[in-house]
Swiss-Prot record:
Family: Belongs to the peptidase C54 family.
A Gene Ontology BP annotation from the UniProt entry: mitophagy
Naturally occurring in which organism (per UniProt): Homo sapiens
Biased composition (Low complexity): 35-57
Record keyword Cytoplasm present: yes
Domain notes: The cryptic mitochondrial transit peptide is revealed after cleavage by caspase upon oxidative stress and cell death. It acts then as a functional transit peptide, and allows the import of the cleaved protein into the mitochondria.
GO CC terms of this entry: cytoplasm; mitochondrial matrix; mitochondrion; nucleoplasm
Listed name of the protein: Cysteine protease ATG4D
InterPro entries: Papain-like_cys_pep_sf, Peptidase_C54, Peptidase_C54_cat
Keyword Hydrolase: yes
PTM statement from Swiss-Prot or TrEMBL: Cleaved by CASP3 during apoptosis which leads to increased activity. The cleavage by CASP3 reveals a cryptic mitochondrial targeting sequence immediately downstream of their canonical caspase cleavage sites which leads to mitochondrial import of the protein.
Catalytic activity as recorded in UniProt: [protein]-C-terminal L-amino acid-glycyl-phosphatidylethanolamide + H2O = [protein]-C-terminal L-amino acid-glycine + a 1,2-diacyl-sn-glycero-3-phosphoethanolamine; [protein]-C-terminal L-amino acid-glycyl-phosphatidylserine + H2O = [protein]-C-terminal L-amino acid-glycine + a 1,2-diacyl-sn-glycero-3-phospho-L-serine
Phenotype when changing V273I: Found in patients with non-obstructive azoospermia; uncertain significance
Length: 474
């Protein structure tokens, strides 16, 4: 998919000419060490970028060239985009992850910056170990929906393990955003500089930073990372997907559910994926309940795959989308533009605020004690018009306990019922009971509606004259 990627000045990328010069370019496919020139093993883009009918050695060089070309193109494109300014209205409120900000003073701007830069940003990577089932060492060009799903799950984990007002203390190197009508507008001047840990902080802050690093490490591009790309691709194989394929938002929701189920490090969190745009409360309750009825419920991430129109977004859904993004328990929306996934986390006026995964960065070795964190946090807010939003997306929510789940249900009922006044169909629905019960009820109701009533006879093969009472005309 056509996408955007990092500024070429910041991240080194190899030129296509390097692929032609290297003598090892025609070695057979298979696991091998990291590529010192920057793009990994020579089969890095086999399934994703084509040449399925080529011989056993030639695709190695061809795919390597294609991978390098695609990464270089992404670098150039992102380098152009990042130079453009993103302006925000100084008059209108901006909603980010359920919080409202008004740029009325310098303090408001700093609070917004601190909140935005604290969200985890998971992007294309290169030079990681080969993905399952092939030799791909980069997801550049095809893994954006998986990355958007990772960001949504990461936001849920931040809410699960850290206080709701937690912010990344080291991320305040952000330049203020452009404000329309501001007396002294400012521009984004590049990524925040990496700062060493603040050892003078108290024990709670240090523990939060340790947890922050642990959450980041769970998304590392390594086969052992529970929510890393390798694990997600492995789980997608049961659905017929492989590395290099396009993943839709609904499929990614189920992959995330399986990943959390199989993670031994996250025992008090479960993921529920709705069926047919319906959240069944009893199914959620059964999922989060413990054997001891008096024990606390587990926390839950609720993922709701929806379609908000035909080929394009139906504008009648925009007010409802805004209402959901204002909800504090909303994790955002995994969607984007057609064939271009983005992670929406807020809005201002008629524009969505998003994190873009199309930023091809080198893989980070998270096994180091103080691995750098700056590439996991975005410092440049971006926005997109609602009209460009792809109608196929997945909305996420988080409830930490039973009380929060009840609060969430009340809030969703209010939002969905108020929006349905102008919509023929709501975005999704909440229902009591279990999905299985509703399926059986629907089946029974269909069977209970007769289209033809045969006369009762006391003897088989006994003819009877039909009358108007023996048939039901629909």
């Amino acid at each position: 998919m056509n996408s955007v990627s990092p500024a070429a000045a910041q991240y080194r990328s190899s030129s296509p000419e390097d692929a032609r010069r290297r003598p090892e370019a025609r070695r057979p496919r298979g696991p091998r060490g990291p590529d010192p020139n920057g793009l990994g093993p020579s089969g890095a883009s086999g399934p994703a970028l084509g040449s399925p009918g080529a011989g056993p050695s030639e695709p190695d060089e061809v795919d390597k060239f294609k991978a390098k070309f695609l990464t270089a193109w992404n670098n150039v494109k992102y380098g152009w985009v990042v130079k453009s300014r993103t302006s925000f209205s100084k008059i209108s409120s901006i909603h980010l992850c359920g919080r409202r900000y008004r740029f009325e003073g310098e303090g408001d701007i700093q609070r917004f910056q601190r909140d935005f830069v604290s969200r985890l940003w998971l992007t294309y990577r290169r030079d990681f170990p080969p993905l399952p089932g092939g030799c791909l060492t980069s997801d550049c060009g095809w893994g954006c929906m998986l990355r958007s799903g990772q960001m949504m799950l990461a936001q849920g984990l931040l809410l699960h393990f850290l206080p709701r007002d937690w912010t990344w203390a080291e991320g305040m190197g952000l330049g203020p955003p452009e404000l329309s009508g501001s007396a002294s507008p400012s521009r984004y001047h590049g990524p925040a500089r990496w700062m060493p840990p603040r050892w003078a902080q108290g024990a709670p802050e240090l523990e939060q930073e340790r947890r922050h690093r642990q959450i980041v490490s769970w998304f590392a591009d390594h086969p052992r990372a529970p929510f890393g790309l390798h694990r997600l691709v492995e789980l997608g194989q049961s659905s017929g997907k492989k590395a290099g394929d396009w993943y839709g938002p609904s499929l990614v929701a189920h992959i995330l559910r399986k990943a959390v189920e199989s993670c031994s490090d996250v025992t008090r969190l479960v993921v529920y994926v709705s069926q047919d745009c319906t959240v069944y409360k009893a199914d959620v309750a059964r999922l989060v309940a413990r054997p001891d009825p008096t024990a606390e419920w587990k926390s839950v991430v609720i993922l709701v795959p929806v379609r908000l129109g035909g080929e394009t977004l139906n504008p009648v859904y925009v007010p409802c989308v805004k209402e959901l993004l204002r909800c504090e328990l909303c994790l955002g929306i995994m969607g984007g533009k057609p064939r271009h996934s983005l992670y929406f986390i807020g809005y201002q006026d008629d524009f969505l605020l998003y994190l873009d995964p199309h930023y091809c960065q080198p893989t980070v070795d998270v096994s180091q004690a103080d691995f750098p964190l700056e590439s996991f946090h975005c410092t440049s807010p971006r926005k997109m018009a609602f009209a460009k939003m792809d109608p196929s997306c997945t909305v996420g929510f988080y409830a930490g306990d039973r009380k929060e789940f009840e609060t969430l249900c009340s809030e969703l009922t209010r939002v969905l019922s108020s929006s349905s006044a102008t919509e023929r169909y709501p975005m999704f629905t909440l229902a009591e009971g279990h999905a299985q019960d509703h399926s059986l009820d629907d089946l029974c109701s269909q069977l209970a509606q007769p289209t033809l009533r045969l006369p009762r006879t006391g003897r088989l093969l006994r003819a009877k004259r039909p009358s108007s009472e023996d048939f039901v005309f629909l």
